[in-house]
Design a protein with these regions (language model features):
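Active-site clefts of carbohydrate-active enzymes
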Residues: 187, 233-235, 240-241, 254-292
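Aromatic- and carboxylate-lined catalytic core of secreted/periplasmic carbohydrate-active enzymes
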Residues: 23-29, 52, 265, 274-276, ...
Length: 332
């Protein structure tokens, strides 16, 4: 190609590319005018009620509601909007700061008495997300409030108050357009946990039939292990976790879920986080961007309906105000 022709070509194509890029990211991440979310007719994917496909592309921000202020939430969500994320996964009753404290979500630590000021803040977080066309994958509580295990606790839920809390949330957020409910929170659905999680889910669904719902299990497990036949579980979520590096974990979890009846969509709601120590041990090294892309490709090319990204520093909204969890290295 003659040099002058090449220069003319660049003069034409470069502004066009810049314009396309600006147009691509100037609007909302998701156009809510296509209607609420639902499961596709073949049971494999998610879509809007008008038939427009929906890609669940999540980011992990478990501690966002508890730890960030409004300017910080605005900054974070704008960053995620420009990157093309469609869902932000976060928690109402967070893990790291318990169920009570300075920014208390509950009065006297009881799920029967939600703090009005805290839930006005939850409302505002949902509103900011909605303004940017972002869904919020909203966990009513982290799992340690049902089953303490390695968490901070305390255990505050039983079958009765879990159902009551679910009904309260369902009534409050039934008309909020940009919610995807996520029951659980890094815990098993076995034993007594089953009845508590089931009651919470059913309580929400009694008052809110608008929104999709799934369950977030502990590492290397799937919601299908306990809840696949539950009518409230619209799609399965598994956690491939932070220890495995090959396809075997997807063969065991994702492919297994795809073969279950009734057919339900499935996605990895917690794959290996970027910059987290492998198997939680710093001497093993850390997962990097290559490892993240590998989990994305393995999920999507195997038939998942979406994918959730996570970063070790971002999920905990780490800053110098807090002690680092899992050897976090930089601020969020």
């Amino acid at each position: 190609m003659p040099r002058h022709v090449f220069i003319l070509f660049l003069a034409w194509i470069v502004p066009a590319l810049v314009e396309v890029r600006a147009d691509s990211w100037s609007g909302k991440s998701v156009d809510f005018s296509h209607g609420d979310l639902c499961v596709s007719p073949n049971g494999r994917f998610l879509q809007h009620t008008d038939g427009t496909p929906f890609l669940y592309l999540g980011d992990t921000a478990w501690e966002l509601i508890y730890r960030l202020n409004e300017p910080e939430v605005e900054l974070y969500m704008e960053n995620r909007r420009t990157k093309g994320f469609t869902v932000i996964q976060t928690v109402i009753l967070s893990e790291l700061d318990g169920s009570d404290g300075i920014n208390r979500p509950l009065i006297n630590g009881s799920p029967s008495t939600p703090d009005p000021d805290y839930f006005k803040w939850v409302d505002r977080v949902l509103e900011i997300a909605g303004e940017k066309g972002l869904y919020v994958g909203l966990l009513p509580t982290w799992g340690d409030k049902v089953d303490k295990q390695w968490g901070a606790g305390p255990e505050i839920f039983d079958e009765a108050n879990a159902r009551e809390y679910g009904r309260w949330l369902g009534r409050r957020y039934a008309d909020t357009p940009n919610i995807i409910w996520i029951i659980g929170g890094d815990r098993s659905g076995e034993g007594k946990n089953f009845t508590v999680w089931k009651a919470m889910a059913e309580g929400i669904k009694e008052c809110d039939k608008r929104h999709l719902m799934t369950y977030h299990p502990q590492g290397e497990h799937s919601s299908s292990f306990w809840f696949h036949d539950e009518t409230w579980l619209d799609f399965n979520m598994f956690q491939s976790g932070h220890a495995q590096r090959d396809y075997a974990i997807y063969r065991r979890l994702l492919l297994n879920d795809l073969q279950k009846q009734p057919i339900k969509p499935v996605l990895d709601g917690e794959p290996r986080y970027e910059n987290i120590p492998i198997d939680f041990k710093s001497e093993n090294g850390r997962f990097d961007d290559f490892d993240v892309r590998m989990t994305l490709y393995q999920s999507m090319f195997s038939g998942a309906c979406g994918y959730t990204y996570g970063c070790n520093e971002v999920w905990q909204m780490y800053s110098d105000k807090y002690s680092p969890m899992i050897d976090a290295q930089t601020t969020w």
